[in-house]
């Protein structure tokens, strides 16, 4: 009936973190996802380039900071939305691994282009032409991020099927919690790399405070 609830008995066997990791590592498709997630972690550093552009450039030069946040944030969201709508159908017809590699490149190159674009027009990024160019760049980056998210979920679902085929059980919870583990691990690695990079160039400690104080006092990248 409508008010009847199906009760599924919980599994008697419980696994700790060590056992769960062994299950994940022993599954070849998921192991490949784990390794690729670690290898992709430096891409997250490129996100800081975008945030630097928004916070230090548009946030300090122009009074319409929220307008630019809406424009570029909308570009990222739009790119993600379109990619997430298209990728499931494309994944049915094309090799998922190649699509994952392509999406990684698609997400990395646009963010990497932000600094060269700044060098081309350091004083004119508020002009319609450059705003349009950056809109396209952010949209492509958002598309790459959205495609990666969908493909990772699809490929982890395939890993669950693989485990069921070879071991006779479906560790859905283990593998999809592993997806969160991959994301957190990648973020941690990228943060370490980013911190080391900032230390090498001297952008840490008192220098960060000095930079922020200078910006608050009216300094701008246009004067460089």
Where are these regions (language model features)?
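Membrane-embedded alpha-helical bundles of multi-pass transporters/translocases
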Residues: 1-224
């Amino acid at each position: 009936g409508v008010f009847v609830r199906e009760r599924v008995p919980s599994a008697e066997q419980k696994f700790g973190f060590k056992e769960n990791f062994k299950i994940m590592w022993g599954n070849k498709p998921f192991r490949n996802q784990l390794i690729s997630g670690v290898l992709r972690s430096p891409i997250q550093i490129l996100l800081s380039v975008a945030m630097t552009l928004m916070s230090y450039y548009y946030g300090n030069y122009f009074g319409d900071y929220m307008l630019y946040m809406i424009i570029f944030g909308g570009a990222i969201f739009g790119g993600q939305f379109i990619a997430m709508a298209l990728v499931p159908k494309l994944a049915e017809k094309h090799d998922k691994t190649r699509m994952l590699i392509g999406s990684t490149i698609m997400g990395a190159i646009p963010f990497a282009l932000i600094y060269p674009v700044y060098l081309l027009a350091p004083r004119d990024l508020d002009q319609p032409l450059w705003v349009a160019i950056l809109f396209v760049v952010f949209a492509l980056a958002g598309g790459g991020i959205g495609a990666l998210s969908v493909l990772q979920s699809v490929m982890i679902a395939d890993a669950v099927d693989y485990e069921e085929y070879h071991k006779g059980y479906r560790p859905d919870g283990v593998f999809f919690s592993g997806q969160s583990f991959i994301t957190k691990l990648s973020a941690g690695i990228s943060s370490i790399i980013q911190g080391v990079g900032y230390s090498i160039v001297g952008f840490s400690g008192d220098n960060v405070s000095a930079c922020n104080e200078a910006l608050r006092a009216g300094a701008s990248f246009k004067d460089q």
